[in-house]
Amino acid sequence: MTPQAALQRVIEHREIFHDEMVSLMRQIMSGEVTPVMIAAIITGLRVKKETIGEIAAAASVMRELATPVKVPYDRHFVDIVGTGGDAAHTFNISSTAAFVVAAAGGKVAKHGGRSVSSSSGAADVLEALGANIMLSPEQVAACIDETGFGFMFAPNHHTAMKHVAPVRREMGVRTIFNILGPLTNPAGAPNTLMGVFHPDLVGILVRVMQRLGAERVLVVHGKDCLDEISLGAATMVGELNNGEIREYEIHPEDYGLQMQSLRNLRVGSAAESREMLLGVLGNQPGPAREIVCLNAGAALYVANVADSIGDGIVRAREAIASGAARAKLDQFINATKKFA
């Protein structure tokens, strides 16, 4: 499909079918499409509203072109990731939860980048903690093997995005590329806890992950507009398990947690996020620890470590209280420094 034909299709609010979208994405990612046409097409898709099929096709091309991290299959492998864009400016909840999960029996292949709309992206806080994030795919694999935790800095694995990045920067609005990152884990983690910035994306992205062959997935959206499981409101959930999809809501009270404002979880920089992360892993009581336990518990459930989210929360608390989660952070940082 030519870019001009694709643009005409989206202007008419008609779907671009799978093979056409695959062809179009390959052209975009190889630099064959001009910046003007890229901007027009992705704007048209946004206005039309991207379909499950269009997103799945685009993600399949991103996966095909990504530089992979080759690790043995493990049913406890999980990615904990968010689309960002929720404008909540909370500390790095998913990054903190990832260390808890790795300490409690999961294996984490975390995929992320620098801040776009938040105060601190995953890459920013890990660097603030002293980790070396500029690892080769082989070094990331070695880190996962040694520590049970690895971080894949997105620009190192999606080099074809260089043709799109300047367009996205200049446009400054959400497009299909905001939701492709969480769908394209270079290590191929079979399980995912994915936070999304809009309620409509819960049902859409859990079905995209189903089409992409994921095993277990929780797509979540806090109804206070958080792209995590929230302490401040009910959370919408789309669950994929054994090929079946369920959609439901969960509440903090379901797990004996008190609903509370996110105000005390906000940060203004990676340094502030670092301090909050260290406080949680140091077992400092408060809402930050509670929201991390809630999200880590869900990740342990989706990673086949816990039998339920509630069981996962118990395991998360134990990993923090015992010092295992903080030890996992230190182990990871030391492992990455060996490659500096």
From Swiss-Prot:
One Gene Ontology term, aspect cellular component: cytosol
Positions of 5-phospho-alpha-D-ribose 1-diphosphate binding: 82, 85-86, 90, 92-95, 110-118, 122
Protein name in the entry: Anthranilate phosphoribosyltransferase
Cofactor binding comment, as recorded: Binds 2 magnesium ions per monomer.
Subunit structure: Homodimer.
Gene: trpD
Sequence intervals crossing the membrane: none
Species per Swiss-Prot/TrEMBL record: Dechloromonas aromatica (strain RCB)
Binding-site list for Mg(2+) 1: 94, 228
